[in-house]
Amino acid sequence: NYYRMSDVLLTSAEESKRSERFRKSQDNFRAAAKLNPGKIEVITVRCGDQEYDGYFCHPVNPKPGEWPAVLFLGGADAYAEEIYFGGKQMLDRGWAMLLVDTPGRGSSMYLKGIKTRPDYEVPGKACIDYLISRPEVDANRVALLGISMAGYYAPRVAAFEKRLKALVAWSGCYSILDDL
C-alpha cells in the first residue's frame, strides 16, 4: 500500500515518521485481511524475552487433514504484510503460510526496536516451534522460504533446524559491491 512505499522515500530528516507510516500500513493490511477468502490470523511468536508479530495464513479451500506449511521470511527491510503477496500462491495450492516480523523487520524494527541478529537460527527455531504447535499443520511437511537478505538467513536456520523438509533460499545479490 501507499504507506509502505512512502517509507522507502522518507529522508533522514523524516525518520520520526517511519513508525507512524508502518502502523498505518499494518492497519490497512489487517483491514483488508478481514475480506480475504482465506483466513489470516494475527499471531505472535515468542523467542526468549521477545515477541514477534506476524500472521498465520490458512490455505484457500484446504483439503481435509493436516496442511503442509511454509515459514516465509522477507528481506532486510521487509514487512510481514508486504511479503504476503509474494506467497499468496502457496495458499491457493493448499499450503498454510507463516509470516513473522523477525528481528530487524517490520514491527520488530519499527515498533519494538528489535534489531537484526547474526544467529538467525534462534528466531527461526521459535517460528518453526510455533508452526508445529498448530494442530492443523503437518509437522512432517514444513518448509522455509527466505527472500533477499532472508535468503542468506534461511540456510543458517535450516542448518540448525532438522524439522524442515524443504528450503528455498532466494538471495538478494551475490556481491552488493559488484551489484551497485
Model-assigned labels for residue ranges:
Residues 14, 18-65:
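N-terminal cap/lid segment of alpha/beta-hydrolase-fold proteins
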Residues 67, 72-78:
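Active-site glycine-rich loops that stabilize anionic/oxyanionic intermediates
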Residues 76-88:
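The serine-hydrolase catalytic nucleophile loop
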Residues 90-107:
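Conserved alpha/beta-hydrolase
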Residues 101, 141-143, 166-168:
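Residue in the alpha/beta-hydrolase core beta-strand immediately N-terminal to the catalytic nucleophile
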Residues 114-140, 156:
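Alpha/beta-hydrolase active-site loop
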Residues 146-150, 154:
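Gly/Ala-rich beta-loop-alpha elbow adjacent to hydrolase catalytic centers
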Residues 159-180:
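Hydrolase active-site cap/lid region
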